[in-house]
């Protein structure tokens, strides 16, 4: 009888340990997924600058969701085809003067198949004696969505901080 009670106790302990192990496995899988999502979103943010600087507006536009919106100092457009046409008209190409964007300070929050991101940008141009000069700097405020298994911009708002194109960031307002 004692062996039966001990065996029953061990069986009950194992039975309760299995859900805990599954829960830990599920938590680990969730954490790994969040890390992978964050890395894919960082790559999306960097590819935005890369395609913009290369004047590859087709690849650039494909970073946006089917109903994705780009909004900035030049206007607001919706949908990849409209974004591509807008950029081809607004930004001359090819990039013969070797200007480029530097992107930094990524803050990314993932929530399932949606995410938000905030980042900084600087636009660098050739200066006197062929030195690099920061001509503009600003921030991006992004809403992202997983579409067809890939992260895309649902909405990207580009704001200039220097020179200013509007009110200062909320953090600097009193």
Predicted regions and their residues:
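Short beta-strand segments enriched in hydrophobic/aromatic residues
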Residues: 52, 64, 121-123, 157-160
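Short, surface-exposed coil-to-beta transition loops
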Residues: 101-103, 135-140
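Short beta-strand edge/turn micro-motifs at domain boundaries
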Residues: 116-118, 137-167
